[in-house]
UniProtKB/Swiss-Prot annotation:
Keywords: Hydrolase. This is Deoxyguanosinetriphosphate triphosphohydrolase-like protein. Residues 66-259 form the HD domain. One of its GO terms (molecular function) is dGTPase activity. InterPro entries: dGTPase (IPR006261), dGTPase-like (IPR050135), dNTPase_2 (IPR023023), HD/PDEase_dom (IPR003607), HD_domain (IPR006674), PHydrolase_assoc_dom (IPR026875). The keyword Cell membrane does not apply. It comes from the Bacteria.
Length: 443
């Protein structure tokens, strides 16, 4: 059944929204090689080099940016696919090509606004009555509409690539909490936790989302839209339950890059100490249920904090390899007709626990610490100030192409969306410079 399904589906998943007739001589590339090239050459991708992954206050240029993070995720993604092909050859025809998984990993962060989570919270607050703001929803919007590779359809990527980029296949109106906190009297008072965005696709992008899902049966569409258990209170967002096989591989690559490579950054930047590692991660990894971690955890700690670059690299490489090689493709716990949805890639249970310990450690000791949060808070204020100014007098302050889009937008909500699109596309430095131009008497 699976093989016939994959054969009947295949050609539709290669289609593009706009059927192109490009003037290209002897172009032998596959659709996914083209998709990868479009992403790689896009302005949105290049801007990732000026968006920081972990906001420390180090003077060194060693730290990872969102661009280097995406390159590492892509390397991990192709590594995951290669080892599944070896271990489970029966899934060879279903697995993404190297170009496809590469494309997904390279593109997965391009919707992230300046100043990371701080920027996301700021834009979500400012857009609270206009459909919200969320990084993954913005990624979908950039690749399907905003990146000017085509006139109307963004990068005009193939359908399977777009499906792979959709981590949360539901509309934000469906995942958003039943009620939202009261708006604050002054934006300095906003609490980031209360305004973290619901995950999903913007409701205004429904036509494009529907186009991506068009090859699926009605039952598959409904099932893909399913939520996890109901949230415990009216202020908690709902979470989607399913995603495509390609997306599950991309997400694992992203998580490993975050949990392991961002840990390396933190050690080098001096954000974490050996005793914090021992208490916050090593002690739990020692009994996470995975024999590799249980056996090697003490030598990993030695190497990570040895002060020797090559030893630290060896430890990081060992952890990455242990995680990669414990990933398998399995049927999902839901009835899907399309093989792209019926299977996902999973870490085995011990390694899943290990990765969640590492991610929690990075979050607690690297992301949530005051020196990082101060930079995020400042970024949050910069973004809200910019939004307030630009939305107060758009025809005066927006750059001409953006102003033109704003004038063409027919409703208040779509006008606000144009402003959110503009601000979210900025790099950290661009946002800071514009803020100085608008508000600093010293500029």
């Amino acid at each position: 059944m699976e093989s016939t399904l994959s054969l009947t589906i295949r050609s539709q998943w290669l289609e593009r929204h706009d059927d192109e007739h490009k003037i290209r001589r002897d172009d032998h590339r596959s659709p996914f090689q083209r998709d990868r090239a479009r992403i790689l050459h896009s302005a949105a991708f290049r801007r990732l080099q000026a968006k920081t992954q972990v906001h420390g206050n180090s003077l060194e240029d060693f730290h990872r940016t969102r661009l280097t993070h995406s390159l590492e995720a892509a390397q991990l993604g192709t590594g995951i696919v290669a080892q599944i092909k070896k271990k489970q050859p029966e899934y060879r025809d279903l697995l993404p090509t190297d170009s496809l998984i590469d494309a997904l990993c390279l593109a997965h962060d391009i919707g992230h606004p300046p100043y990371g989570h701080g920027g996301e919270v700021a834009l979500n607050y400012m857009m609270r009555d206009h459909g919200g703001f969320e990084g993954n929803a913005q990624t979908f919007r950039i690749v399907t509409q905003l990146e000017p590779y085509t006139e109307h359809f963004g990068m005009n990527l193939s359908r399977r690539t777009l499906l792979g980029l959709i981590k949360y296949p539901a509309f934000i109106s469906q995942t958003r909490a039943a009620s939202q906190p009261a708006p604050v009297s002054h934006q300095r008072q906003i609490k980031a936790k209360q305004w973290s965005p619901a995950k999903g696709i913007y409701d205004c992008d429904k036509a494009l989302f529907d186009w991506v899902l068009a090859p699926l049966s009605e039952t598959d569409k409904q099932q893909l839209n399913a939520m996890r258990d109901c949230p415990h209170d009216a202020l908690s967002h709902r979470k989607t339950r399913y995603k495509s096989l390609d997306c599950s591989i991309m997400e694992l690559a992203d998580d490993i890059a975050y949990g392991v490579h961002d840990l390396e950054d933190a050690i080098v930047l001096g954000l974490v100490t050996r005793s914090q590692w021992q208490e916050g991660a090593a002690s739990q990894l020692a009994d996470c249920g995975d024999p590799w971690f249980e056996k090697h955890i003490s030598s990993i700690g030695e190497m990570l904090f040895s002060g020797q670059h090559h030893q630290r690299k060896d430890a990081i490489g060992g952890m990455v390899n242990a995680l990669l090689t414990s990933i398998d493709v399995k049927p999902v716990d839901g009835e899907f007709e399309s093989p792209l949805l019926a299977f996902n890639a999973y870490l085995d249970i011990g390694m899943e626990k290990a990765l969640s310990i590492l991610k929690h450690f990075v979050s607690q000791y690297v992301i949530q610490i005051p020196q990082v949060q101060i930079v995020e808070y400042k970024g949050q204020q910069i973004i809200m100030d910019l939004f307030e100014a630009l939305s107060a007098d758009p025809q005066r302050l927006l750059p001409l192409p953006t102003r033109h889009r704003w004038e063409l937008a027919e409703t208040d909500t779509s006008k606000m969306r144009v402003i959110a699109d503009y601000i979210s596309s900025m790099t950290d430095g661009h946002a800071q410079r514009l803020h100085q131009q608008l508000f600093s008497s010293h500029h």
